[in-house]
Amino acid sequence: MLPPLLLVTDRHGADRPLSETVRAAVAGGARFVWLRDRDLDAEARRALARDLIAILAPVGGRLVVGGDPDLASEAGVQGVHLPGSAGIDGIRALREKLGAAALIGFSAHSVAEIAAAEAAGADYATLSPVFPTASKPGYGPALGLEALRAACTASRLPVFALGGIDGGNARACREAGAAGVAVMGGVMRSLDPRSETVRFVAAIA
């Protein structure tokens, strides 16, 4: 079973080095991290991935890297999170490349995409944007809790609610059937990421 809080990295939003922000979040209970920061060059991203693995390993945490199976293999990352643009064929190709043990996530933006991701062999998916958010422009209006509930009902795939998640709505996402919530700005931009993570973990427990 995957931890119910998926922490999404954003070094531009953090007020300290990203590794320090993640370390603080892990101290607050984060056990599942998605390394995005796709604008880094390959070597810098590889080094960052290794730093995050070192932070997560002592607590049995898991790291997935956004859209880069080669980096996952080189850095020893447990899995890859694919963008929606990769499509269903991308999930199948990645499974063939990485094998059955790899953790594969997928960014979905509709109920139909959740069902398709399950059929293609993904291990989990994010559904976004559930709520209005400045972090996820370009994906249309917020889907809302009813779409989240429909996605969770229609599929056995663990679904993580993403987009506009905060301490006031995280619990509602779980009650709608989500396996968890994916949070970026709520923790990355916090002046106290440890305490903010503690609050999120408590809200969705």
What is each stretch, according to the model?
Residues 35, 131-137:
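A short acidic, helix-capping loop that chelates divalent metal ions and anchors anionic groups
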Residues 1-89, 95-123, 150-159, 166-171, ...:
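Conserved N-terminal beta1-alpha1 strand-loop-helix module at the mouth
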Residues 70, 146, 182:
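Active-site phosphate/pyrophosphate-handling residues
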Residues 136-142, 147-149:
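Substrate-recognition "cap/lid" segment bordering the active-site pocket of phosphatases
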